[in-house]
Amino acid sequence: MHLSMDTLGMVDDSGHGIVDSYDMAKGAGSSNGGRVHSIDVILGFTKDQEPLLHSVGDDGSPKVNGALQQDPAKPVPSEPYGNLPELGDSSQHHSYHDSSLFSSDKCEEMSNLTKEVDIADGSPKSIKEEEHGKKKHRRNRTTFTTYQLHELERAFEKSHYPDVYSREELATKVNLPEVRVQVWFQNRRAKWRRQEKMDTSTMKLHDSPMLSFNRPPMPPSVGQVANPMPLDPWLTSPISSATPMHTIPGFMSSPQTLQPTYSSHSFLNSPPGMVQGMQPMGPPAYQCAPPFNDKYPVEDDRNSSIAALRMKAKEHIQSMDKTWQHM
């Protein structure tokens, strides 16, 4: 395969394209009249594919080196884009507006759908609007006077469920609507039920056998602090655990050795003949207390109620005598 020297020498330093070399090689081959091994033949292009090698403009004129080769005999059209449809054609705009896609009914339907979707999703905006609407319809609270509350409480004590006539009469009396009176009775009954339930639960807690186990033990410091505190003389018992039994006048073996230092009251049922040999001390209205008989042992006196009462009376008399002696 041999290339002609004319074809190889056509590429100069200016860097012209393959198209210029192809044109000049074609002209050289045609002038020589021999077989020309051109670039098209080497590359395998045929005559049918020859127009693909040339740049064709809008009007079919070949383009060489990026420029159009205009035929001087062919007139250039003044509007090269005249064959394209006008973008501002009014007929097309009318066709779009006449379609049902942008009609007012469709727009309203779309807006309704968006509202329904917002409500279904529970958007904060819709919730705020609903709350705002509810606040508008809220009724003002009724402020009762002292007289009204007093009359209502009196009626509630008489009957927890007054009838319509009683409520109307009470409403006229306290200058309130009958509906307000009815609502007040409903609230008062609910409060009464709650109070009853609380009282019942409190009673059950007190009666529970497990309550004693749940009580916390008393700290030892409480007993230590409470013991050294002094008491009043009339609150202290004259008979202590350290007092020997033979020093108590009522428990002596013989009634003759009893000294008349204690007075008696009129409510003590003393048998006759037991107060002989005793002289009253202190105020003249009081007499000496009779001694207890030996036939009543200490255990029987503590167990019987009469003996316990006598013991308490005796202790009271002794404490009173001590206070008079200090005076």
Swiss-Prot record:
It is found in: Nucleus. One of its GO terms (cellular component) is nucleus. It holds the Pfam family OAR. Residues 52-140 are annotated as: Disordered. Gene3D superfamilies: Homeodomain-like. A motif (Octapeptide motif) lies at residues 37-44. Residues 52-61 have a biased composition (Basic and acidic residues). One of its GO terms (biological process) is regulation of transcription by RNA polymerase II. InterPro entries: HD, Homeobox_CS, Homeodomain-like_sf, OAR_dom, RAX/RAX2. Keywords: Developmental protein, DNA-binding, Homeobox, Nucleus, Transcription, Transcription regulation. This is Retinal homeobox protein Rx2. It comes from Oryzias latipes. The lineage of its organism: Eukaryota, Metazoa, Chordata, Craniata, Vertebrata. The gene is rx2.
